[in-house]
Amino acid sequence: MSKANTLVEILGSTYKIACPPEEADAVKNAAVYLNNKLLEVKESSGLDEKKAAIITALNITNEYLKNLSN
């Protein structure tokens, strides 16, 4: 399976993600979702980027696990 580089932007930084071409849109959508969640946490809490990333990861994991139970 071939991989292509997909560029995403999260908190003002650009990342090059290697993924199969057919998954590029999903990766971009995930990055937009993550960026929005990070901004929500940063703006509402005033936390630095590292702490906001940890809280955001915990929140997203909690959402994911709740959805698995349903």
What residues fall within each predicted segment?
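Short alpha-helical interdomain "coupling" segment at the junction between an upstream regulatory sensor module
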Residues: 48, 69-70
